[in-house]
């Protein structure tokens, strides 16, 4: 069973995929989106779903530290609703609090990547962490 993890932002969607057995997550890519113009990257997402034979999505929920929901949670849920409609696949949500902070820390401390390069990979790594946290919780 292949599961795709998504870190949905206002300008990009970080994408990760599980291995076929569902044990590990691998960052795939970052899809540029534009909420204002209505471009949500669904064409590219469709290509990835077909290529990896995805069975389920896991979308990160950016809850506030006090466990309340803000506008980005609503945007992530709306994105999840739309991909359910488009792909007819189940969507589950994973708390993503601090995953971007964790991803940035990993890139600085372990990979010593410059700030400019971090921006290019951070959403992909955040998606990988979201998916890996989900997989760890499920198995």
Swiss-Prot record:
GO terms for molecular function: nuclease activity. This is Putative pre-16S rRNA nuclease. Gene3D superfamilies: YqgF/RNase H-like domain. Transmembrane segments: none annotated. GO terms for cellular component: cytosol. Keywords: Cytoplasm, Hydrolase, Nuclease, Ribosome biogenesis. The keyword Transferase does not apply. Could be a nuclease involved in processing of the 5'-end of pre-16S rRNA. It comes from Streptococcus agalactiae serotype V (strain ATCC BAA-611 / 2603 V/R). It comes from the Bacteria. Its EC number is 3.1.-.-. NCBIfam families: RNAse_H_YqgF (TIGR00250). It is an enzyme of class 3 (hydrolase). GO terms for biological process: rRNA 5'-end processing. It is found in: Cytoplasm. Disulfide bonds: none annotated. Belongs to the YqgF nuclease family. InterPro entries: RNaseH-like_sf (IPR012337), YqgF (IPR005227), YqgF/RNaseH-like_dom (IPR006641), YqgF/RNaseH-like_dom_sf (IPR037027). Signal peptide: none annotated.
